């Protein structure tokens, strides 16, 4: 992941130049907004294999307080963003921000919907570093047990180290089936 192109001219230029210089995949981070995805696609123009990494909050606390939204609107926005990014011709990775605190039934519903929309990779972040390893592993296992189309995408983890558990949580996620 080479940068967040819409965040600054420097990040945009970094993604452009890295895309020109390397022969491997290059990823650009976005929010689930049209302008973010458009700018990321432009920055990835020279990439041999580009990926747009887009997403939205999945926990009720993020949905209500960060996005002033509802679960239904998050489902709609997330699937729209995946389809829009996919139509740019790049691989798409979706992040379910704050998945560590998300309701598991809703998280599974969101993951299934974005895979149906075309996500190649679904990232399950412990955004706040809130999870303990055994619980994070169970969270990933729940997705593998309840998302019908989970075999159509790569499930990845992204654990923060607020409690010093990022490595342990990552290993727990991998042991539960994430890659």
Where would I find each of the regions flagged by the language model?
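Active-site-adjacent loop and "lid" segments of alpha/beta metabolic enzymes
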Residues: 159-165
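Short secondary-structure junction/hinge motifs that connect adjacent elements
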Residues: 3-9
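Alpha/beta enzyme core
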Residues: 9-21, 34-155, 169-178
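Glycine-rich phosphate-binding "P-loop"
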Residues: 1-2, 66
């Amino acid at each position: 992941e080479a940068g967040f192109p819409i965040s600054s001219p420097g990040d945009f230029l970094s993604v452009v130049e890295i895309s020109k210089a390397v022969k491997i995949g290059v990823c650009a981070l976005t929010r689930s907004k049209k302008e973010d995805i458009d700018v990321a696609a432009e920055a990835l123009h020279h990439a041999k294999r580009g990926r747009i990494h887009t997403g939205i909050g999945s926990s009720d606390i993020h949905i209500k307080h960060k996005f002033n939204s509802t679960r239904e609107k998050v489902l709609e926005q997330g699937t729209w963003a995946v389809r829009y990014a996919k139509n740019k011709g790049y691989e798409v990775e979706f992040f379910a921000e704050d998945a560590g605190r998300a309701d598991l039934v809703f998280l599974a519903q969101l993951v299934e919907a974005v895979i149906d929309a075309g996500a190649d990779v679904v990232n399950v972040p412990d955004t706040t570093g809130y999870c303990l390893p055994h619980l994070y592993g169970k969270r990933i296992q729940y997705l593998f047990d309840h998302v019908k189309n989970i075999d159509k995408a790569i499930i990845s983890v992204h654990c923060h180290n607020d409690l010093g558990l990022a490595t342990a949580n990552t290993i727990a996620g991998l042991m539960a089936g994430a890659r």
